[in-house]
Amino acid sequence: MKSLRWRYTRLPSQVEDALSGEEDKEEEEEKEEETTPAPTPVPEHPMVPQLAGASQVLGASEMSQLSLHLPPRVTGYSWSLAFCTSRDGFSLQSLYRQMEGHSGPVLLVLRDQDGQMFGAFSSSALRLSKGFYGTGETFLFSFSPQLKVFKWTGSNSFFVKGDLDSLMMGCGSGRFGLWLDGDLYRGGSHPCATFNNEVLARQEQFCISELEAWVLS
């Protein structure tokens, strides 16, 4: 090889020696470039999910941020507006009716009368139940104004419970991470063991201005 001749042959000047060293270095760099894999490109901005319906609560930025925290299995799913209070009225029973026939996960989002946006992701459709249901994929979130996500701690499995007159998500010491009344007008939020969450609204008790339930499928 040419590089071996340069290494063992006496060169007439230091200039030639320096040049040979530079060429050796260039050959080594070329080999490194051939063997080093190119880094995987990272998207500059999260993708806005495909929507079937228009949200009165979340904008494109909030939806994109939330999509980054959804379980990998729902990546690429479209969001369908199954229920909204402006269209279907302020009624928990109406919400349950709109959930009939759906089995996929649900993103519940709301804005209270203070303008605060928050909600929850449920791994399955919202429904009436005798006890708590759901999986560890369930989480709570709030925009205050930056997005905060409160994932399952593993402390208990009190994910979602649907009664005729209330909907509850997360529980601990008799307090709920998020609960809504039967009229979908009043609600509350407290720290709970399920998600180790902060109070989602500005106050523990709040009044709902707009609520939406998006089915992911």
UniProtKB/Swiss-Prot annotation:
Cellular component (GO) terms are:
nucleus
Question: Pfam families recorded for this chain?
Answer: TLD
Top-level taxon of the source organism: Eukaryota
Q: Where is the TLDc domain?
A: 56-217
GO terms for biological process, alphabetical: response to oxidative stress
- Write out the biased-composition intervals (Acidic residues): 19-35
InterPro entries xref list: TLDc_dom
According to the record, the residues making up region (Disordered) are 1-48
Please report which protein family the annotation says this sequence is part of: Belongs to the OXR1 family.
Instruction: Name it.
Output: TLD domain-containing protein 2
Query: Lineage from the top down?
Result: Eukaryota, Metazoa, Chordata, Craniata, Vertebrata
Coding gene? TLDC2
